[in-house]
């Protein structure tokens, strides 16, 4: 299983408030160790890796998580607690 976290970078270069909050929760819980990749969706760069992933998965908010397992469709989560409940604590 591969887990990717996509964080938003605002036009002024700062991280979005919700992204900061989610990162804090991931670090506090220890779940950050299970995140394989963290990419940025930069509002100033539509070709940034996170913006490309957002388009590919039809997501219009951040942060979001993409969970990939071989032979299965990707699962996308835009709600932190749903991600934790379904992927971190099954």
Stretches with model-predicted labels:
Residues 67-90:
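Non-catalytic, surface beta->alpha helical segment in thiol-disulfide oxidoreductase systems
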């Amino acid at each position: 299983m591969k887990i990717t976290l996509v964080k938003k970078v605002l036009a002024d270069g700062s991280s979005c408030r919700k992204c900061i909050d989610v990162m804090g929760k991931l670090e506090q819980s220890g779940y950050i160790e299970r995140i394989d990749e963290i990419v940025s969706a930069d509002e100033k760069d539509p070709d940034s890796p996170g913006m490309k992933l957002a388009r590919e998965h039809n997501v219009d908010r951040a942060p979001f998580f993409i969970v990939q397992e071989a032979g299965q469709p990707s699962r996308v989560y835009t709600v932190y607690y749903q991600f934790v409940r379904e992927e971190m604590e099954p």
